[in-house]
Amino acid sequence: MNRREFFGVTLLGLTRKSGREIVGGFVHDTAALGHRLRDGTRFPAPQRTQKVPIVIVGGGIAGLSAAWRLQKRRAEFVVLEMEDSTGGNARADRNDTTAFPWAAHYVPVPGPRATLVRELFEELGVLESGAWNERYLCQAPQERLFLHGRWQEGLEPQVGPTRRDRDQFARFEARVDAARATGQFTIPMALGARPSPLDAKSMADWLREERLDSPWLRWSIDYGCRDDYGARAEATSAWAGLHYFAGRERQEMGPLTWPEGNGWITDRLLERVGGAVRTRQMVYRITRKGRQWSVVTPDREWQADVVIFAAPSFLASRVIENGPATPDFEYSPWLTANVWLDRWPQERGLPPAWDNVFFDSPSLGYVVATHQSLRTFIPRTVWTYYWALDRGTPRENRIWLLTQRWQTLRDRVLADLSRAHPDVRDCATRVDICRMGHAMIRPTPGFLTSAARHQLTAARDRLFYAHSDLSGISIFEEAQYRGVTAADAALRAISG
């Protein structure tokens, strides 16, 4: 179903007059700011110069993780963030009822190889004496799926698949177990990834080769690819498609989550490094001057010994003198919406879960911000709704997303929610929408082995790249790993 067909069908449910207007608008809308870099806008020359050993460009999780590492090593640094707040995809807000996320909203319980995540979580009290703090483990019920007009437990379809479909689910799980056993599908991915022929083909092609053609299985795999990559199986490398499943333990006790999602981690990192963070500082030029780097913002020129570039890698060619091109880097656009509800909508089937998914919907569903509350009853709540624009090319979808009116997108969100909650419009008071044109990297076929990716992962003259897009996987663990390893490289460069 394309966008036009989707609007034609779902907006039928919103043609009646509502008793009240649902307010809201676009939030964290920084496309115009970023496009100044794209369009080569001339900026005023800075009037001040300041020296610092290390400059971190970008205040998302990668940049904040680099700062966390440097702070622990007592290094001097500054973090320059273009927007008015840090966190990137791990950003959050709050109303009178609850905090709520704008994108990243959980971290799977990290396995033994995710040592950096475990170190941080021990410091934050999430991991205590080897045990996970139950306060942060997602409470039951965790997931439900809206299918055939009712909610069912879990995300694997229960009603509809035949014995043949079930056999294919079992065969696929066996393939995942075999992939996991190779040790090449790790988190962080750099610890295990090796050149693989799986990277040369799409996940859809691999499924055809394996004769896994169940439409129910295909929906589940598409959902996984959309969830982590913002792309369907046709546009995802088979290596990355398998990594979504094989990179985690088969039996997990998590995930770890908070009302504000990964914004909770952002806040904890800022408590430690916030004094070195400078927001509203657009870095528009980075050049080499003798033995130092010149990092220029409209406010001032920073002279640094080392630069950690933790902004999205596609910006390198626009900002860094002779910066590398990134033709293989594709980014998925996303829409997220926070729907404020002054009462709970009607339910059909199971009670609300933390993660609520609609079968065969363009969206990925919604999470409930108040799910972790210890109160027995909360009359109001906030639902965070996720839509990865995965039909058509990323560029086409970005243009479409940025040209839509807020009212049109608001009605689209409510229409999708109304398939399971017919009275949602009567319960909603506000819908705020965040448009993210380059929300996450797409690991397209060939990306893992691409020359552009390998060029960026190699050190270059005291400039180290640190964004999660270097992994091809836009998740917290990868962003943290890239930030910390870049910080370690920066420390070695300075001490050497």
Model region roles, listed by residue range:
Residues M1-G13:
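N-terminal secretory signal peptides and thylakoid transit peptides that target proteins
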Residues R48-I54, R380:
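A short, charged/proline- and glycine-enriched loop
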Residues V52-V79:
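N-terminal Rossmann-like FAD-binding beta1-loop-alpha1 element of flavoenzymes
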Residues A181-R285:
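Active-site/ligand-binding neighborhood in enzyme catalytic cores
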Residues T279-T384, A420:
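Mid-domain catalytic core of redox enzymes
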